[in-house]
């Protein structure tokens, strides 16, 4: 199995929620809007991300020749919203690379020591992001309204996917 995890970064929020502020020091996200120094560039980036996600969601896997037959290596795309720090730590500020890395290491250490906490956290992130019953529902929810700006994730579906319970 191949799994890929992406940040949503508000990609599916309506374009009119992107506001331009030339004096903004960095792109700022909230649950209802995105403020940036270059609105057109950010909208173009979001369009690229939406199109990329749309293409990846259509993939069921990768085909590989093995001997005389073709083998399917299953593939599935998962998300965190808005990003890892927002989903898992509730951080809404923009972090530099060093703080992102140290935060990820602390999370990994915490979850390694308490795997049940990891599972509980994934289920909580699923519930607060529309409480979808299926992987497909999770993506439909994430693509509606402002949900790609809200905290949440569909990573709770990784384990059932790897166990062969999701098709």
Name what the model sees in each region.
Residues 3-167:
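C-terminal accessory helical subdomains adjacent to catalytic cores in phosphodiester-
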